[in-house]
């Protein structure tokens, strides 16, 4: 008899990652000093957590085990993860729960708007789990969330970090029509690593998704990111930059992959701060308006400040 246990001590009855339970443990090298972060203990962190709980919301900060949660929540910055806490994909790098999700909460867009208002966010980031079980991948729900935030917080700028909507015709168009200020879709890794890291996705589909946003509405900023430390080569990272620029992506993020549990993909290497700095320099020479590359860079880390820089960079080009 096989005993199924929750590898994150969630519950012995329902594994958080059932597809990973019987995998052998993978070993990652010890974290270097530049990766260490402080435990979250501040009053601002507690206030943000309370607002999230009061509105019954899920955040990617918690679900994905983001190392920056203490810093961001202390400043009352949170990234809302909508459409539930269970993803229909099973990416090898991700700590979000996998399985069959619950039905959508029709009141969620209003709850997100209310939390955005209570936190006083000048810039809000909304992401989601993949919902391959829905005909439109949840696109209408994301669009409704954008509209709800606009109605409640008209001066707040909105960034969405979306799934790939693979085989979901018309889904992307619904979100673009809702006019987020930033459309983010992460490539996550280089093409050669997709089969082992992101097997449910298709690299060139994701590139085309980003390109299509610009074709529909060139005024929307586009953004994408990758993790390093998954076994990629430097020349592959540079090729991803070129592919993104061919799709007119404005903003690139590059961060260090950190292994959530021993059942997830191992960290193959830790990229040094100097290497990240070099990636950033090269990316700017390729034409990105904004680049964030560092060991702890994540898609929504410093998103508000980075949006202001992104807008200023485009305004400068228009002069």
From Swiss-Prot:
<feature type="binding site">
    <location>
        <position position="61"/>
    </location>
    <ligand>
        <name>[4Fe-4S] cluster 1</name>
    </ligand>
</feature>
<dbReference type="GO" id="GO:0005737">
    <property type="term" value="C:cytoplasm"/>
</dbReference>
<feature type="binding site">
    <location>
        <position position="66"/>
    </location>
    <ligand>
        <name>[4Fe-4S] cluster 1</name>
    </ligand>
</feature>
<protein>
    <recommendedName>
        <fullName>Lipoyl synthase</fullName>
        <ecNumber>2.8.1.8</ecNumber>
    </recommendedName>
</protein>
<keyword id="KW-0479">Metal-binding</keyword>
<comment type="similarity">
    <text>Belongs to the radical SAM superfamily. Lipoyl synthase family.</text>
</comment>
<dbReference type="InterPro" id="IPR003698">
    <property type="entry name" value="Lipoyl_synth"/>
</dbReference>
<dbReference type="GO" id="GO:0046872">
    <property type="term" value="F:metal ion binding"/>
</dbReference>
<feature type="binding site">
    <location>
        <position position="91"/>
    </location>
    <ligand>
        <name>[4Fe-4S] cluster 2</name>
    </ligand>
</feature>
<feature type="domain" description="Radical SAM core">
    <location>
        <begin position="73"/>
        <end position="289"/>
    </location>
</feature>
<dbReference type="Pfam" id="PF04055">
    <property type="entry name" value="Radical_SAM"/>
</dbReference>
<feature type="binding site">
    <location>
        <position position="87"/>
    </location>
    <ligand>
        <name>[4Fe-4S] cluster 2</name>
    </ligand>
</feature>
<dbReference type="InterPro" id="IPR013785">
    <property type="entry name" value="Aldolase_TIM"/>
</dbReference>
<feature type="binding site">
    <location>
        <position position="300"/>
    </location>
    <ligand>
        <name>[4Fe-4S] cluster 1</name>
    </ligand>
</feature>
<dbReference type="InterPro" id="IPR007197">
    <property type="entry name" value="rSAM"/>
</dbReference>
<feature type="region of interest" description="Disordered">
    <location>
        <begin position="1"/>
        <end position="28"/>
    </location>
</feature>
<keyword id="KW-0004">4Fe-4S</keyword>
<keyword id="KW-0963">Cytoplasm</keyword>
<keyword id="KW-0411">Iron-sulfur</keyword>
<comment type="pathway">
    <text>Protein modification; protein lipoylation via endogenous pathway; protein N(6)-(lipoyl)lysine from octanoyl-[acyl-carrier-protein]: step 2/2.</text>
</comment>
<keyword id="KW-0949">S-adenosyl-L-methionine</keyword>
<dbReference type="GO" id="GO:0051539">
    <property type="term" value="F:4 iron, 4 sulfur cluster binding"/>
</dbReference>
<dbReference type="InterPro" id="IPR006638">
    <property type="entry name" value="Elp3/MiaA/NifB-like_rSAM"/>
</dbReference>
<dbReference type="GO" id="GO:0016992">
    <property type="term" value="F:lipoate synthase activity"/>
</dbReference>
<keyword id="KW-0408">Iron</keyword>
<keyword id="KW-0808">Transferase</keyword>
<feature type="binding site">
    <location>
        <position position="94"/>
    </location>
    <ligand>
        <name>[4Fe-4S] cluster 2</name>
    </ligand>
</feature>
<feature type="binding site">
    <location>
        <position position="72"/>
    </location>
    <ligand>
        <name>[4Fe-4S] cluster 1</name>
    </ligand>
</feature>
């Amino acid at each position: 008899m096989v005993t199924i246990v929750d590898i994150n001590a969630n519950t012995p009855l329902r594994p958080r990652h059932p597809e990973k339970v019987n995998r052998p443990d993978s070993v990652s090298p010890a974290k270097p000093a530049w990766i260490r972060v402080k435990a979250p203990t501040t009053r601002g962190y507690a206030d943000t957590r309370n607002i999230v709980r009061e509105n019954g919301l899920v955040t990617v900060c918690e679900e994905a085990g983001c190392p920056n949660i203490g810093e961001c929540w202390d400043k009352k910055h949170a990234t809302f993860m909508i459409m539930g806490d269970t993803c229909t994909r099973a990416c090898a790098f991700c700590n979000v729960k996998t399985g069959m999700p619950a039905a959508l909460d029709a009141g969620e867009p209003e709850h997100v708007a209310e939390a955005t208002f209570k936190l006083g966010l000048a810039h809000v980031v909304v992401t989601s789990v993949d919902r391959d079980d829905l005909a439109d991948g949840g696109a209408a729900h994301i669009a409704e969330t954008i509209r709800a935030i606009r109605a409640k917080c008209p001066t707040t700028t909105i960034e969405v970090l979306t799934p790939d909507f693979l085989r979901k015709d018309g889904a992307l168009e619904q979100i673009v029509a809702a006019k987020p200020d930033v459309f983010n879709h992460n490539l996550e890794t280089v093409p050669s690593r997709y089969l082992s890291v992101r097997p449910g996705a298709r690299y060139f589909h994701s590139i085309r998704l980003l390109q299509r946003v610009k074709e529909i509405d060139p005024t929307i900023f586009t953004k994408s990111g990758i993790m390093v430390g998954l076994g990629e080569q430097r020349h592959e990272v540079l090729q991803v930059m070129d592919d993104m620029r061919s799709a007119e992506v404005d903003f690139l993020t590059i961060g260090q992959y950190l292994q959530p549990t021993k059942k997830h993909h191992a960290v193959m290497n830790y990229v040094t701060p100097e290497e990240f700095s070099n990636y950033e320099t090269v990316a700017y020479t390729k034409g990105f308006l904004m680049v964030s590359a560092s060991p702890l860079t994540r898609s929504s880390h410093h998103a508000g400040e980075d949006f202001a820089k992104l807008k200023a960079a485009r305004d400068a080009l228009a002069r």
